[in-house]
């Protein structure tokens, strides 16, 4: 183990030695000689052969030569400590290599280098993690999770290679964002435009930025984008973002209001509502999304009704929407969305987008 640990350490400091060698060539020659010896030892270990004991002794003698002269009785315990530290170095190095490989595979298959907490990965797109952010798991649970993540990564490889058809995951009533309805200066998507799917949580800031990016880039004009609102639920049964469940219920209630109507009679309160939440601001300049999250349940409900009135909803519309948001129909829609998200699309974070035959984790970036 001493030989392998020495090779790891020598390999890591190689770049610094290369710089020093410019000024001290003898130092560089001594380093390369030691590195070759260490590599020869590693090669023998790989071939299940014994390392040269003289190299191991050379390493120990270099480290202990002053101790031998001054404190000879310390040599044996210090030699044992060197062996232990060598084992630790090798284990840590192997763990680091495996973790790096796992992170790269996760980034390729799942779109995040951190399977459990996608939002903690700085290499992927911005995303809201599922479930609780805090990690109070003990060492055994963390170790078990480390191995479980390998299974998740390999299980995701077929999904990474498959051709994703967004329309397969639509849930009725399907809400297609009409850019023309949101902004008269924009064009509505053509009937033959490709389909796309946005799986969003109305309280997630990454979802807000993703929606804005799509709106500004013309994505809603070039694609027929279906919106599925999926309020992230915590382990205790509550919701990650305040009032996201309420907003989702109102969203699907307004979608049901247009169900069965001819295109010219549809009111598009659903698209207008999600547009207001993701792009709007209060008179004081606060983002509508964060404003709704700061309200109590009853206050948020009253504010949503005010939004609908702004969109032209009549008293009859408001009564029907209030009835629908508590109905079994909306509960069934949310259950179908949950099933599509967790069991069919197998999301690892929000937003999750499907377009151009691929599944994408994180906010849309043009």
Residue ranges of each PLM-predicted region?
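Membrane-interface motif at the C-terminal end of an N-terminal transmembrane signal
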Residues: 21-24, 91-109
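Hydrophobic alpha-helical membrane-embedded or membrane-associated segments
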Residues: 8-13, 45, 83-94
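Loop-to-transmembrane boundary segments
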Residues: 58-93
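C-terminal cap of thioredoxin/glutaredoxin-like
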Residues: 298, 302-366
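Hydrophobic alpha-helical segments
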Residues: 1-53
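Extracytoplasmic thiol/disulfide redox context detector
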Residues: 103-245, 326, 330-346
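Cytosolic juxtamembrane regulatory segments of multi-pass membrane proteins
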Residues: 45-61, 121-131
